[in-house]
Amino acid sequence: MSYSTQQDILDFVEDNNVKFVRFAFCDIFGTQKNIAVLASDLSKALEDGVCFDGSSIAGFMHVEESDLVLRPDLSTVTILPWRPTEGRVMQFFCDVEKPDGAAFGGNCRGFLRSMNRKFKKLGLTCNVGAECEFYLFENDDRGRPTRIPIDFGGYFDVAPLDAGENIRRDICLTMEQMGMSPQHSHHESGNGQNEIDCHHAGPLKTADNVMMFKQIVRAIAMRSGLHASFLPKPLPDQAGSGLHINLSLYMDGRNLFEGDIAPDSIAGSFMAGVLAHSRELTVFTNPLPNSYQRFGCDEAPRYVSWSRQNRSQLVRIPQVKGDNCRMELRSPDPACNPYLAIGLVLAAGLDGIEHRMVLQPPVNKNLFHPAEAEGLGLETLPASLEEAVQAAQESEFLHRVLPDELAARYFTEELKRCEALKNAADPAEYERVHYFNAI
């Protein structure tokens, strides 16, 4: 059934014993929020939207003009399977607008949607996939997270070294119940680290899937008495967690990343744009102070370069065929706002296409070894969140593509993060409370 009208939704609610409906959205950093509406009030909420206090949401509104409205995207409706079957809970993803119906500059879903439309106007179809890594930790006797991983397994290990296989199984089955398409599931390099990948989809669908995936993982982990962490570098001596973004472009049904990529082709110019703007984008793809502990080791890039297959590069072209042909951006981490991260990567690629940027030759060296990078003159990604904010603030490109309101508030909030950690009496404890326990 296609849920395209309000009556479709109301019929679904009645047929499935739904009692609560979550209107879900995210703040400027990608932290999911929601308002639950009782099913008896759903008709009015669908008609009028749901008003809320935008001044209480990071990066949204000032208190003197705080009202905002949630407008549900009816196509995103889903039942939350881990909630009770009696009095079931349903959820929409929502766009955010002003009370008079005017566009709200902080509506990150809207930003990604508008960017995708620009590709469609050029006759291009974007497919996006996300590879999301996360850690599973034990809780203490009081149910509080510890930094003790659930196992000592490594890459592709199996039980008993891999203690997360049943958790991943439950996650994948829940994803399928909710209309998502998990593709791969395995233990990652770090102790207690896991990865589950979804099939590629349109940009907005993939960003919604990332938000839903994190919600599912946390719910299944909590049900199992565990803590799921999407912190980029939760353990200093273990691999960091990434959110690799895979992108392919289609024109007239043909995958432009299939076969050799000419430096001045559409695919080549798209890659050139992503590489050219990668430093400016880093504050959006890697938004935490902790994010910068991940770069340069454990398969996380530091240099702005590309290659085929080589996992030490910022961008790589996997050795695959057909519809699987794509470029992979390896710098983003799972703490990012997926709507902004994917939207800005698309914007950078589009800038490359529109300005006919030419892709530079590949770098076929292992850049995890600093000696290999010496003498190549490669640009580096920012080494800290402060440096990333500065690069973004100085970016003419970002001033062109981002709504001024959104950019100003994002940079302000990021600088607050830097100052808070810098001024903390115990930075490690501050990170534990504000990031490890929450991200």
Residue ranges with predicted function:
Residues 1-439:
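Glycine-rich, acidic/polar active-site loops that bind/position phosphate-bearing ligands
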